[in-house]
């Protein structure tokens, strides 16, 4: 397995810059693993492919406005801080621009002093650890001062920040959206429930490491980022009941896949709990819990493309991607969706 095995040609104009309206009007490519057949549908047709007793597992993380624009306390020079991972109550792993100015002890002021950050030191990946000082509730300050951190390949301003949140987002803490969930509307979720599909909620807070490129030709040598997950006892019990009843577990997004496969025993039993996962799923991996997947179209040479290749098979996925390009599907975070059965 080589990194180049996961490359494909993508015209830039197919990288979606804005989401479609309504959410479930996006296209849906249905990939059948057993037959290799590929269908072209609309996302609102999803209920036709799910059966009573199936379980849909959604990630209810909420994207935080993690981009902070501030200035150096000493000189007034502009600084940008991107929150990546909460290490302690007021200590964060961040990315800082310009990084050369972010030396230990440097103080960065945001919102006329409502929030002040002190650089503690560097991280392993070129970022900075920052301690924040403030009065009140940090989350409230961030909602007031922060901006939504859109992926680097989206160049247009987002008119409605809520369009980069799923309709079921609850648990504050992600630096990027679990984008497969962006296609769901409340009405579509109601239709699925009326069909007898069970909906189970888990949480994985998405870090910007999800956009970190693989830089080694042997992907197995890639160091995965770690992300925080939480699976409640209620969710675990419901998910296990789906499997015992003969239903399929349909993960919404690669984040749900990584969470389920982290907490599943060898026999597929899902255990409740929380912690950090750096699971890396690539071809050859044996899935323990996940039977099907709703996902978006991923970047060339990315760990997410490797994950979907592990589930559907490398050759079938690459054929599906070539067909998606030929059929002018929209790619990446605001793009169209794929259902792998």
Curated annotation (Swiss-Prot):
Enzyme Commission number: 2.4.99.17
Enzyme class: transferase
Keyword terms of this UniProt record: Cytoplasm, Queuosine biosynthesis, S-adenosyl-L-methionine, Transferase
Gene Ontology molecular function, alphabetical: S-adenosylmethionine:tRNA ribosyltransferase-isomerase activity
Catalytic activity: 7-aminomethyl-7-carbaguanosine(34) in tRNA + S-adenosyl-L-methionine = epoxyqueuosine(34) in tRNA + adenine + L-methionine + 2 H(+)
Entry's Gene Ontology cellular component terms: cytoplasm
Any single GO BP term: queuosine biosynthetic process
Cell compartments where the protein resides: Cytoplasm
Major localization listed first in the record, in broad terms: cytoplasm
The protein's annotated pathway: tRNA modification; tRNA-queuosine biosynthesis
Record family assignment: Belongs to the QueA family.
Function field: Transfers and isomerizes the ribose moiety from AdoMet to the 7-aminomethyl group of 7-deazaguanine (preQ1-tRNA) to give epoxyqueuosine (oQ-tRNA).
PANTHER family xref list: S-ADENOSYLMETHIONINE:TRNA RIBOSYLTRANSFERASE-ISOMERASE
Subunit structure: Monomer.
Record's protein name: S-adenosylmethionine:tRNA ribosyltransferase-isomerase
The organism of origin for this protein: Symbiobacterium thermophilum (strain DSM 24528 / JCM 14929 / IAM 14863 / T)
Native organism taxonomy: Bacteria, Bacillati, Bacillota, Clostridia, Eubacteriales
Gene for this chain: queA
